[in-house]
Amino acid sequence: MAISVTKSGPYFTSGAISFSAMRSTFRLNNPTGTISASELLRDTNASNSDPILPDATENSDVATSTNWKTSQIRDSIKFYNLTQPSGDTNVNLDIDAQAWNGNLGRNIVKKLNLEGTCGSNSTSQSAAQLNQLANNLTIDVSGDIFGCGADATVTGPDGLDGGDALEITGGGNNIKINLQSTGRIYAGGGAGEHGAVGSDGQSETCFDYIFQNVNSGCGFCGDCSSLGSGYTRIGGCNGAGGCNCAGWGWWYGCRQTNLTAAECRKQENTVVAGGTGGAGGDGGRGRGFNFQSGSIAGATGGAGGAFAGCGGFTGTVTAGSQGNTGETGGNGGEWGESGSNTSNTGDGGDPGKAITPTGFTVTGTVNSSTIKGSY
């Protein structure tokens, strides 16, 4: 069903028009006693919250200062109402675009009854908005006005902000939002902050051996240190026959021994990086018209990268490890709440506003069940 229009009137569509009838019709706060013609002039004062005969398109025939006649009262109206029926859903309801017949900025007392649902699927657009001048308007909410919840934070680090529920920016006088006990004006929740990347795993130190020989000689073993720092002898320098030999007569002998080459070894260490840290988890999405049920928890972080190890090397000096798991993303915000923070460098997303920005009063049943979010 479409948004419908109802009026208090038109009155005096035919027949005689008496002052007593006009008094009963238009001066509702004092329907007894006499009423003068001056009281029945069309009141165009935009700041008057209770005009006797209001300024309205339908009342344009009624004089405002002089030349008033009873005939001008014919087909006049007192109040002007619009109603969104229960069961209807309007996305991004443009209040000032409805069938006000030019009366939105006039001082006729008006009411917009929102009995269905207003919602938004975009955080950049409020669920319902009034962007033009309005006077003497009551928005009576017995249904729902739900802002858009922020999408999950898939890139980081900051969570996205939730969307507003009701936006009133046109200005004017006597603008009220009246909440029935069944009414709900809920701002969209912010998204959780993206989880931080997990830390890298412990590096491992692997080693290989480098082998070289150093020539020995007569009476001496080769010096492994001549190869450079870190070389040590692990073998060689075995006897390989005499040297520096001589004989006298029947005796022959060697004063020294030839030695085989010195067998040298050096341990060469290589640092192998630990496994890379796992990706941080996505921040949870915020509650909103676009996500009224379901989990708003942040996603689990990714597993850390595998550690390559010392395969292909001779051995291990110190052991390394796999990368650490990424941090779980922050939870999204419930209606009108911020997304949760993590240890990452950003913040969870802010919630939208229940009603924004200024220039209105909130009446009726106002509690944590009927409004979620700031106003």
Predicted regions and their residues:
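Glycine-centric low-complexity repeats
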Residues: 2-375
